[in-house]
Amino acid sequence: MATLKAVCVMKGDAPVEGVIHFQQQGSGPVKVTGKITGLSDGDHGFHVHEFGDNTNGCTSAGAHFNPEGKQHGGPKDADRHVGDLGNVTAKGGVAEVEIEDSVISLTGPHCIIGRTMVVHAKSDDLGRGGDNESKLTGNAGPRLACGVIGIAKC
């Protein structure tokens, strides 16, 4: 069973930056690990966006990666975008990322390689905010930092 790896170097408005690693064994869940620094303390939305285009900063990455046309939700919800990874929590300006997700993949139709990882300014309400924006973005606010997810050496 082959192990696949990917990496994302996130940059944005100073001082927010980070490096995120992705690892998947066979068709198992993807382990997402890493660190993002320069954040305000608290929860920040953390999503895979549709395009690997950062020509106009993080805005050109498009919407959340959502090949099945579902509503925004939390990472444990059946009704969610593929790219909905919930929140990362910063303490002392640093978010230690440790997520395991069975919806994203490093191969096939849910493949995130070549797409953009984004950390947002505000907490993701996981689609439970009671308004239209909640069902699209989780009201996570502006994009603080982003980077294209690329294949890494195994």
Swiss-Prot record:
One of its GO terms (cellular component) is mitochondrion. It holds the Pfam family Sod_Cu. It is found in: Cytoplasm; Nucleus. Destroys radicals which are normally produced within the cells and which are toxic to biological systems. It comes from Gallus gallus (Chicken). It is an enzyme of class 1 (oxidoreductase). InterPro entries: SOD-like_Cu/Zn_dom_sf, SOD_Cu/Zn_/chaperone, SOD_Cu/Zn_BS, SOD_Cu_Zn_dom. Gene3D superfamilies: Superoxide dismutase, copper/zinc binding domain (2.60.40.200). Zn(2+) binds at H64, H72, H81, D84. GO terms for biological process: removal of superoxide radicals. Cu cation binds at H47, H49, H64, H120. PANTHER family: SUPEROXIDE DISMUTASE CU-ZN -RELATED. It comes from the Eukaryota. GO terms for molecular function: copper ion binding; superoxide dismutase activity. Keywords: Acetylation, Antioxidant, Copper, Cytoplasm, Disulfide bond, Glutathionylation, Lipoprotein, Metal-binding, Nucleus, Oxidoreductase, Palmitate, Zinc. It catalyses: 2 superoxide + 2 H(+) = H2O2 + O2. This is Superoxide dismutase [Cu-Zn]. The modification N-acetylalanine is found at A2. Homodimer. Binds 1 copper ion per subunit. Belongs to the Cu-Zn superoxide dismutase family. Its main location: cytoplasm. Disulfide bonds join C58-C146. Its cofactor is Cu cation; Zn(2+).
